[in-house]
């Protein structure tokens, strides 16, 4: 592995005995699985591995060398991996379903999603409409000075426009307003006020000239703004456009300087500030921004916000400072900035040239070399907006109840393994340990899809306000549908939550989630596919791949952030101080370990602080999924013989298959520009390190491959938490 270990790591202080070590009277036997699914799995591994490499020296190259060689990054992508290939497959499948959906045997809401997709795909109608629908949108928001000759700010009220785009589009510039569970009373939804996201990366915005690479990205962003304005107003003065673009970037830079970086927001006590709207008015120290009026504009169709209404204010200083900044800023700059953020989010839904502008910026930012096809854009967009309706189509065709039950059983086996880990660790006091076990037992498993989407009446009721789709006027339909979908979330304000029915995702998604405020894991149907899961293949592979994904989300309940919430997801400190100190010491081991790695393409060190939660989860996932696999062997034994399924044509043992199943899902390559971006901002480490670092911390891996102590894959010093 082409990385350098630069600092000493924490020494493992304890180790739990695996089930295989505790029951030596069972005879272990292997049998080759020759079923079609096992033959497919064997072929996939053989085509991925470079067996000329010593696995104890460079396991990533051993597991992934051939896969990387055979899979160059496509021009339109910033990265390629088996997970990306799975995502592509799901999108292709969904696109075919949406193209061919008819009124026969489909719920009304499902047909609306198909019509929406087909309208999105009508490139000719888009070009006929041109940019006029976008210009009309911006006009309704007070105009965009860059594209509006003679614009006057005399009657422009930026607060009203921010509230309007928040309500109608879910776009939240300057101030982020959203409805979510109250983190300290998760049975109820509450209004949340937070710092906004930006059009450019925070690090670049804070210091616009910090490096030649930053200057290149900022220049690309500036060109993106100017080119977009030119599409709306071809006759605009170039000097004025350049000046406006510079003012937008400088204003956004100041916003970013007021913001708090993500690694400083991992402790909930830093952002959970519950108070009344009247108190927000006081602590933000202003008389020119009326919070009650602003929030009632956001929540226009819903119960009235009063001065005594409680909200959560995340960032007091940011909010106070940006309100003062906005008050002192020329209305033209405010209107240009808000209009730009709207245009950046929605412009590419109009003409081909807008999509070209977006591509030119992404070419600089993340290194892609070709624009993504419209079909891919429309599929992803439709899933994002009407995901439950699309998900219904997907699960009806591509997910069986048999598979769901099989994976549910796998989840419970990993939960049992985790419970064993908690019971047997030596660093937790018994009070904290018991509370951790209570939380684990209360953790909700949301598998594949919410059951209510299978009921036509319930699904139609959920989307009842979605209007009929006009295929000739896609952008108009987009605005109407978006407003309805955003109203569904805003409409939850002041209503109770439902830990079972409320999902954080929709079914046709290739990802997995842990939600701290509901203490629940979600595994959408999209991710429950090969190469992560295959019904009937070697259990070692399933436990190593989808089992590790499950273990990863389960571990999030006990990482540096998830560990701050109780079994119902409320912010509660349930740790005794001595145990908390030991937890922090072990978490610091991971911070130092990952920060010591140098990513060779970018010559950048990993950010062990921002990624610590994900790294804790990756390491806990591998350890507990392996324990669960061993437990599975015990439970499936017959006449005191544990039969391990191996694969044809491979000399790998079942234990080795487990670790190959884990690492091969992280095979891949990523463009340098994208890697630079992800190392700065992503809470996950790059795939190569996810594939390997948890294995260097695993004694079971070293035993499976016979790696001597002190080899790269079995270092003397290891980090261990769960």
Swiss-Prot record:
<feature type="glycosylation site" description="N-linked (GlcNAc...) asparagine">
    <location>
        <position position="609"/>
    </location>
</feature>
<keyword id="KW-0378">Hydrolase</keyword>
<dbReference type="GO" id="GO:0046872">
    <property type="term" value="F:metal ion binding"/>
</dbReference>
<feature type="domain" description="Peptidase M13">
    <location>
        <begin position="32"/>
        <end position="722"/>
    </location>
</feature>
<feature type="binding site">
    <location>
        <position position="556"/>
    </location>
    <ligand>
        <name>Zn(2+)</name>
    </ligand>
</feature>
<feature type="disulfide bond">
    <location>
        <begin position="56"/>
        <end position="707"/>
    </location>
</feature>
<keyword id="KW-0482">Metalloprotease</keyword>
<dbReference type="Pfam" id="PF05649">
    <property type="entry name" value="Peptidase_M13_N"/>
</dbReference>
<dbReference type="GO" id="GO:0005886">
    <property type="term" value="C:plasma membrane"/>
</dbReference>
<feature type="disulfide bond">
    <location>
        <begin position="64"/>
        <end position="667"/>
    </location>
</feature>
<keyword id="KW-0964">Secreted</keyword>
<feature type="disulfide bond">
    <location>
        <begin position="33"/>
        <end position="38"/>
    </location>
</feature>
<keyword id="KW-0732">Signal</keyword>
<feature type="disulfide bond">
    <location>
        <begin position="120"/>
        <end position="378"/>
    </location>
</feature>
<dbReference type="InterPro" id="IPR008753">
    <property type="entry name" value="Peptidase_M13_N"/>
</dbReference>
<feature type="glycosylation site" description="N-linked (GlcNAc...) asparagine">
    <location>
        <position position="207"/>
    </location>
</feature>
<dbReference type="InterPro" id="IPR000718">
    <property type="entry name" value="Peptidase_M13"/>
</dbReference>
<dbReference type="InterPro" id="IPR042089">
    <property type="entry name" value="Peptidase_M13_dom_2"/>
</dbReference>
<feature type="glycosylation site" description="N-linked (GlcNAc...) asparagine">
    <location>
        <position position="184"/>
    </location>
</feature>
<feature type="binding site">
    <location>
        <position position="614"/>
    </location>
    <ligand>
        <name>Zn(2+)</name>
    </ligand>
</feature>
<dbReference type="GO" id="GO:0004222">
    <property type="term" value="F:metalloendopeptidase activity"/>
</dbReference>
<keyword id="KW-0325">Glycoprotein</keyword>
<keyword id="KW-0479">Metal-binding</keyword>
<feature type="glycosylation site" description="N-linked (GlcNAc...) asparagine">
    <location>
        <position position="100"/>
    </location>
</feature>
<feature type="disulfide bond">
    <location>
        <begin position="589"/>
        <end position="719"/>
    </location>
</feature>
<keyword id="KW-0645">Protease</keyword>
<dbReference type="Pfam" id="PF01431">
    <property type="entry name" value="Peptidase_M13"/>
</dbReference>
<keyword id="KW-0862">Zinc</keyword>
<feature type="active site" description="Proton donor">
    <location>
        <position position="618"/>
    </location>
</feature>
<dbReference type="InterPro" id="IPR024079">
    <property type="entry name" value="MetalloPept_cat_dom_sf"/>
</dbReference>
<dbReference type="GO" id="GO:0005576">
    <property type="term" value="C:extracellular region"/>
</dbReference>
<comment type="similarity">
    <text>Belongs to the peptidase M13 family.</text>
</comment>
<feature type="active site">
    <location>
        <position position="553"/>
    </location>
</feature>
<feature type="binding site">
    <location>
        <position position="552"/>
    </location>
    <ligand>
        <name>Zn(2+)</name>
    </ligand>
</feature>
<keyword id="KW-1015">Disulfide bond</keyword>
<feature type="glycosylation site" description="N-linked (GlcNAc...) asparagine">
    <location>
        <position position="424"/>
    </location>
</feature>
<protein>
    <recommendedName>
        <fullName>Neprilysin-1</fullName>
        <ecNumber>3.4.24.-</ecNumber>
    </recommendedName>
</protein>
<dbReference type="InterPro" id="IPR018497">
    <property type="entry name" value="Peptidase_M13_C"/>
</dbReference>
<feature type="signal peptide">
    <location>
        <begin position="1"/>
        <end position="17"/>
    </location>
</feature>
<dbReference type="GO" id="GO:0016485">
    <property type="term" value="P:protein processing"/>
</dbReference>
